[in-house]
């Protein structure tokens, strides 16, 4: 019985480590900044505050990526938003337009904005 509990504890710890910020940690924030400036800053603004020139014309306004609300989102949630968009907002999905690596890089950069 103790062996089963030990195995379950090891599996739970492994799952916690594996499900952590792997996408952000695996991404390159410097590369992500370049992708962000090219594809995201028009709406989200140069510092990710949701105040880009195109974003000013949108309703609802683009997310402030430096906010506590964004910081509370899991990496998986943010990655899904980047990949699939966020209806009914103007946020489009970037899967197919950006590689998985570029999406990971953007996620790492977005995470760096809230620090």
Predicted segment positions?
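Amphipathic alpha-helical interaction segments
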Residues: 14-15, 43-44, 102
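Periplasmic/extracellular electron-transfer cofactor-ligation site
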Residues: 27-29, 33-60, 84-93, 113-115
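Extracytoplasmic electron-transfer domains, predominantly the class I c-type cytochrome c fold
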Residues: 59-113
């Amino acid at each position: 019985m103790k062996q089963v509990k030990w195995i379950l504890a090891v599996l739970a710890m492994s799952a916690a480590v594996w499900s952590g910020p792997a996408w952000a940690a695996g991404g390159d924030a410097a590369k992500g900044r370049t992708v962000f400036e090219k594809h995201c800053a028009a709406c989200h603004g140069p510092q990710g505050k949701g105040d880009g020139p195109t974003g000013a014309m949108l309703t609802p306004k683009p997310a402030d990526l430096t906010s506590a609300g964004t910081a509370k989102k899991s990496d998986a949630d943010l990655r899904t938003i980047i990949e699939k968009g966020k209806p009914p907002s103007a946020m489009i999905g970037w899967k197919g337009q950006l590689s998985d690596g570029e999406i990971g890089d953007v996620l790492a950069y977005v995470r760096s904005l809230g620090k």
